[in-house]
C-alpha cells in the first residue's frame, strides 16, 4: 500500500497532457491510506477529461467518503501513450488521489455511459492486475462492479463484471459497502468471494450474472434462470424517491486541467416523461423527480462561491421542463454575488420560443451557439418517435434565436428511424434550409449546423424490437443529405460514422455470447473505440465471424414479441405491455398519412392522466413536480393543436428552396 | 486604473499542469476572493490578467509573475479598499495547493509588461543520463571532473551550436549568447545515476533559452529533472533586478538544501 508516484513521475515528461494523472482537484479527498477501510476505486473507462466531470461518479465519491470505514478514490483510462509506458515498466493502473495500485482496492467500480467503452473496461481491469474474466478471480482480487445507463442490458459484459448496479446508486452503494465490510472482516477466505456475490445478488438493484444460468436453442435465448432459490428472477432497478434528500455533489471536483463540461453542474431533476420512443435515458430514469427550487438556488450559490466557476449548468434530460425554470434562472442571474459575470447553460433545450426566451436571458454574458434536437425531419417521422415538435414550434424557436442575436444554431437529428423513408431523411435538409431562411431575415451570415447520428435501438425502450439500419443504408442516407445540402452555404452537415453506429448496435442489444467478441477485440488492441483515430470496424466484424455470431442477426433483425430479450430479467419498471403497445402505436402513427397520426402519440404524464407504464406504480413512488401544469408556452404535445403539426409557415414554403 | 503585480510559486504535483491551466486557476481564485478585476469589453469579456513568460509544463518555479488590472473605482488602501499587502495570503487560500502567491505590489502606470521586460531567468535542475542513453563517461570516477570540463568548454567557446526539434522540424541555433552563467552545484545523490545539480542564468531574448538546450550542449544523452525557475530578471538603469522590489519572503528560499521536492 505505497504510493506509486515515484515511479509514475518520471513517465510524465514523456506523455501528452500529464495533468491527467496527477489528481490534485479541489474537492478531492487528497492522499490517504486505505487501511481498515472498504476501499472503492471509482473508474471511468475513458480518458480523464471525459471521465472527471461524470456526475454519477462524483456523487458516489462523496457519499462513500462521508461514510465511516469507507474510502473512495478515482481512476480513469490512461491514454495510449501512458498505457504503453506503464506496461513497459510493469506499472499497474493507479488511483489519481493517492496514486495507489488499483489492486489494493476492494472494488473497482465502473461507470458505463456508452457501449463503445466496453473494451476499455477490460483493459482497465487487466492493467489493474486482475483477471478479466470474473470466473478466474479469487478472494485476493477486487470485485469488479459497474453502474450507469448501459447496465440496463448488462449481458455483453456478464463474463467480466462481478456485480452490476441497476438504477440510482445513492442508496445501494451503502448496502454494498456493508456487505464488503463483512467479507473483509471474515478474512476473504477461499470460497468467500462466491458467498459474498450470492449475498449481493439478494440486494435490491444488484445483478450478479454468475448467479444466473443462460440457455439457448440455436441462436435464440430461451431462458435466464437464477441458480439459487433466494436470488430474484427479475432484478428491479433502484430509484431514489426524493432528490431533495440527496443534495450531491456538495463538493464538486474542480480539475486543474481542462475537461469537458468544465463548469458547475447542478442536477435540477432526474427522469423524463416526454416519452420519446428512441430515448433510453427517458425510459429508464422515470418518474420525474424535481429538486426543490430553493435547494437548487442554494447549491448554485454555494457551488459558485466554492469553485470560482463563472458558469453553471442546470442539468437534467430536458431542463426547460423544470417547474419555474424562469424564476430559478432569473434568481441566479440577478444574484448580486454573481455580479453579472455568471452564465447559465441549459443542456437539452426544448424546441420552442419560450425556451429561447430563457436562453437569451441566461446567455447575456457569453453567447455561444444554441442547440435544438428536433431528431427527425418530418412531422410524420416525429409522430413515430413521439417527439411532437410542430414545424411552427421549430421555426418559432429559430426565429426567436436569430432575432435575439444568435447567428448560429445547431440541430440534432437521427437517421435510420423506424418507418423512415427518403422523404423523411431529406426532410432534415429542408428543415435546416428553412431555418437558414429564417435566420437570413436577421443576419446575412446566419448558419445552421445539422448534426446527424445513426439510430441505435436501445434496450428497455419501445424501439427495442426494431432492426437497425445497416451501415451501408445509413451511409446512403447521409449521402442523400450531403447531396441535398451541398450547395447551401448556410447549412453545415455533420454526421456520425455509420461504422461506429454498427458496433454500438452489436454491444447495445447483445447477449452473453457477445462477451467473447468484446474480449477478442480488446486482446487485439481495440481500446478507445469511441475515438475515431482508434476505432477499427474490422476488429469487430472479424471477431463476430470468429465466434460464429451474425451481425445481421444481432443488429439488423427485427424482433418478435415472443422473443426472450437478453435484458428481460433486468427491469426499469416498465411493463412489457406498455413498451409493446407504444411500439405498435409508433408503427400505426407511421402508417397514418395526415394529421391524424398524433392520435397514436403518448402524452407527457406529468400533466396528463397516467397511462401506467409501470415506473411509478411498481415501486410505490410518484412524480415530484412543483407545478401540476405544463410549462408556459406548452409544447411538444402538451396543450397544443397537433393536427397542425406539419404546417409550414407560408413565407417559408414560398422562399426556401435554393 | 490600478495595476498590481503578483509573484507566485508553482511546486509539487501541480507542476504537471500547463500555462493555460494555471491561467484558469488564477481566474477562479480571483472570483473566489471577489477581487474587482477590470474586464475586457466585447462579446466575450475576459478579466484583464497578463501572465509573464510561460513556464514549461513539468517545471517548478518560485519566481512566477502576473499583472492584474483592477476596475477604476477600486481603492487601494487597507482602510476602505483592497489591502495589497494582505493579497498574497487571501489569494493563496483560494488557489490550489502547490500554487501560492508570495508577494504583491502596485506597479506604476506605464510599467512595461512582463513579456517585454524580463531579460533573463535563473534555473536550477538536475542533469541525468536519458533512459537507455550511452554515456560511458558518466559512470566513471571522473564524471564530475568531466562534466565540469564540459561546462568550462561551453563557457569559453565563442559559439555553441545545438539542434533542437520544434513542431517536428529540426532547428539549428547558436545558444552561446543566451547562456549568461552556468555552474555545477553538487551531486544529487551518492551515486552518479542520481545526477548533478546545475544552475544557469539564461536569457529570454531573442527567445527563451531552456535548460534542456544547455544539456544538449553538454551531452545530447543528458536530460533534465526537477527543473525549477528561481528568478526572473529585468534591467533597470543598467542594473539587474527582479520584477518586484519586495525582498524574497523567507519561505521561498532557493538554497540547494531546500530543493527537496514538494510532492
Residue ranges of predicted features:
Chain B
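N-terminal ordered "arm"
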Residues: 11-39
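A short, aromatic/hydrophobic, helix- or strand-capping loop or linear motif
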Residues: 36-44, 102-106, 161-168, 227-230
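Ordered, amphipathic secondary-structure segments that act as subunit-interaction surfaces
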Residues: 62-124
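Short amphipathic alpha-helices in soluble, non-transmembrane regions
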Residues: 78-95, 137-157, 214-215
Amino acid at each position: 500500500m505505497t504510493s506509486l508516484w515515484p515511479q509514475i513521475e518520471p513517465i510524465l515528461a514523456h506523455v501528452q497532457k500529464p495533468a491527467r494523472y496527477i489528481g490534485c482537484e479541489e474537492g478531492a479527498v487528497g492522499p490517504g491510506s486505505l487501511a481498515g477501510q472498504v476501499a472503492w476505486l471509482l473508474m471511468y473507462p475513458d480518458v480523464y477529461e471525459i471521465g472527471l466531470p461524470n456526475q454519477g461518479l462524483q456523487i458516489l465519491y462523496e457519499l462513500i467518503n462521508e461514510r465511516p470505514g469507507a474510502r473512495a478514490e478515482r481512476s480513469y483510462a490512461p491514454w495510449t501513450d501512458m498505457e504503453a509506458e506503464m506496461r513497459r515498466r510493469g506499472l499497474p493502473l493507479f488511483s489519481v488521489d493517492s496514486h495507489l495500485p488499483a489492486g489494493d482496492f476492494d472494488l473497482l467500480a465502473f461507470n458505463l455511459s456508452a457501449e463503445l467503452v466496453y473494451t476499455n473496461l477490460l483493459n482497465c481491469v487487466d492493467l489493474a492486475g486482475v483477471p478479466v474474466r470474473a470466473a478466474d478471480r479469487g478472494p485476493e482480487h477486487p470485485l469488479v462492479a459497474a453502474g450507469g445507463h448501459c447496465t440496463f442490458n448488462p449481458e455483453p459484459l456478464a463474463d467480466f463484471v462481478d456485480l452490476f448496479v441497476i438504477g440510482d446508486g445513492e442508496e445501494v452503494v451503502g448496502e454494498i459497502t456493508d456487505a464488503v465490510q463483512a467479507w473483509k472482516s471474515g478474512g476473504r477466505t477461499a470460497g468467500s468471494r462466491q458467498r459474498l456475490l450470492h449475498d449481493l445478488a439478494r440486494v435490491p438493484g444488484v445483478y450478479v450474472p454468475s448467479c444466473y444460468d443462460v440457455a439457448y436453442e440455436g441462436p435464440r435465448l430461451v431462458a435466464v434462470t437464477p441458480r439459487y432459490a433466494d436470488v430474484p428472477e427479475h432484478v428491479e432497478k433502484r430509484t431514489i424517491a426524493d432528490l431533495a434528500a440527496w443534495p450531491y455533489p456538495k463538493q464538486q471536483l474542480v480539475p486543474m486541467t481542462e475537461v469537458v463540461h468544465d463548469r458547475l453542474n447542478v442536477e435540477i431533476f432526474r427522469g423524463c416523461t416526454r416519452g420519446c420512443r428512441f430515448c433510453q435515458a427517458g425510459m429508464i430514469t422515470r418518474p420525474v423527480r424535481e429538486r426543490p427550487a430553493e435547494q437548487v438556488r442554494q447549491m448554485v450559490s454555494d457551488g459558485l462561491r466554492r469553485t470560482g466557476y463563472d458558469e453553471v449548468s442546470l442539468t437534467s434530460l430536458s431542463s426547460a421542463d423544470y417547474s419555474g425554470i424562469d424564476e430559478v434562472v432569473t434568481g441566479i442571474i440577478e444574484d448580486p454575488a454573481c455580479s453579472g459575470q455568471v452564465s447559465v447553460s441549459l443542456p437539452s433545450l426544448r424546441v420552442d420560443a419560450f425556451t429561447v426566451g430563457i436562453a437569451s436571458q441566461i446567455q447575456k454574458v457569453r453567447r455561444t451557439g444554441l442547440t435544438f434536437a428536433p431528431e427527425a425531419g418530418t412531422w410524420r417521422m416525429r409522430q413515430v418517435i413521439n417527439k411532437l415538435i410542430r414545424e411552427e414550434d421549430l421555426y418559432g424557436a429559430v426565429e426567436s434565436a436569430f432575432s435575439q442575436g444568435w447567428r448560429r444554431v445547431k440541430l440534432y437529428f437521427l437517421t435510420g428511424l423506424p418507418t423512415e423513408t427518403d422523404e423523411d431523411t431529406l426532410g432534415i435538409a429542408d428543415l435546416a434550409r428553412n431555418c437558414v431562411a429564417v435566420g437570413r431575415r436577421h443576419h446575412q451570415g446566419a448558419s445552421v449546423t445539422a448534426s446527424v447520428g445513426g439510430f441505435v435501438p436501445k434496450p428497455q425502450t419501445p424501439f427495442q424490437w426494431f432492426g437497425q439500419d445497416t451501415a451501408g443504408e445509413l451511409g446512403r442516407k447521409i449521402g442523400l443529405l450531403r447531396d441535398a445540402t451541398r450547395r447551401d452555404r448556410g447549412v453545415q452537415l455533420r454526421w456520425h460514422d455509420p461504422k461506429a453506429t454498427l458496433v454500438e448496435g452489436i454491444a447495445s442489444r447483445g447477449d452473453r455470447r457477445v462477451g467473447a467478441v468484446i474480449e477478442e477485440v480488446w486482446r487485439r488492441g481495440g481500446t478507445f473505440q469511441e475515438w475515431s483515430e482508434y476505432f477499427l470496424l474490422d476488429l469487430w466484424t472479424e471477431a463476430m465471424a470468429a465466434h460464429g455470431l451474425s451481425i445481421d442477426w444481432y443488429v439488423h433483425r427485427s424482433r418478435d414479441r415472443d422473443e426472450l430479450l437478453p435484458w428481460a430479467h433486468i427491469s426499469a419498471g416498465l411493463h412489457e405491455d406498455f413498451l409493446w403497445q407504444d411500439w405498435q402505436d409508433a408503427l400505426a402513427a407511421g402508417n397514418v398519412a395526415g394529421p391524424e397520426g398524433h392520435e397514436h402519440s403518448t402524452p407527457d404524464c406529468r400533466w396528463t392522466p397516467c397511462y401506467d407504464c409501470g415506473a411509478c406504480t411498481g415501486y410505490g413512488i410518484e412524480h415530484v413536480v412543483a407545478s401540476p401544469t405544463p410549462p408556459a408556452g406548452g409544447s411538444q404535445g402538451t396543450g397544443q393543436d397537433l393536427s397542425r403539426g406539419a404546417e409550414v409557415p407560408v413565407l417559408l414554403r414560398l422562399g426556401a428552396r435554393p | 486604473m490600478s495595476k498590481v503585480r503578483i509573484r507566485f510559486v508553482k511546486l509539487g504535483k501541480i507542476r504537471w499542469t500547463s500555462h493555460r491551466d494555471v491561467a484558469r486557476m488564477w481566474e477562479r481564485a480571483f472570483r473566489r476572493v471577489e477581487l474587482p478585476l477590470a474586464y475586457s469589453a466585447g462579446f466575450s469579456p475576459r478579466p484583464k490578467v497578463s501572465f509573464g513568460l510561460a513556464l514549461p509544463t513539468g517545471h517548478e518555479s518560485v519566481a512566477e509573475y502576473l499583472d492584474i488590472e483592477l476596475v477604476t473605482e477600486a481603492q487601494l488602501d487597507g482602510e476602505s479598499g483592497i489591502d495589497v499587502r494582505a493579497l498574497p495570503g487571501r489569494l493563496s487560500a483560494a488557489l490550489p495547493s502547490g500554487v501560492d502567491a508570495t508577494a504583491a505590489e502596485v506597479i506604476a502606470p506605464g510599467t512595461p509588461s512582463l513579456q517585454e521586460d524580463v531579460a533573463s531567468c535563473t534555473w536550477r535542475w538536475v542533469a541525468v543520463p536519458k533512459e537507455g542513453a550511452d554515456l560511458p563517461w558518466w559512470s566513471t570516477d571522473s564524471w564530475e571532473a568531466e562534466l565540469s570540463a564540459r561546462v568550462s568548454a561551453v563557457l569559453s567557446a565563442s559559439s555553441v551550436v545545438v539542434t533542437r526539434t520544434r513542431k517536428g522540424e529540426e532547428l539549428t541555433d547558436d545558444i552561446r549568447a543566451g547562456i549568461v552563467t552556468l555552474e555545477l552545484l553538487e551531486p544529487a545523490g551518492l551515486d552518479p545515476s542520481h545526477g548533478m545539480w546545475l544552475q544557469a542564468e539564461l536569457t529570454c531574448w531573442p527567445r527563451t533559452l531552456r535548460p534542456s538546450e544547455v544539456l544538449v550542449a553538454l551531452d545530447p544523452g543528458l536530460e533534465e529533472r526537477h527543473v525549477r525557475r528561481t528568478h526572473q530578471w529585468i534591467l533597470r538603469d543598467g542594473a539587474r533586478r527582479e520584477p518586484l522590489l519586495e525582498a524574497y519572503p523567507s519561505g521561498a528560499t532557493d538554497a540547494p538544501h531546500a530543493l527537496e521536492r514538494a510532492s
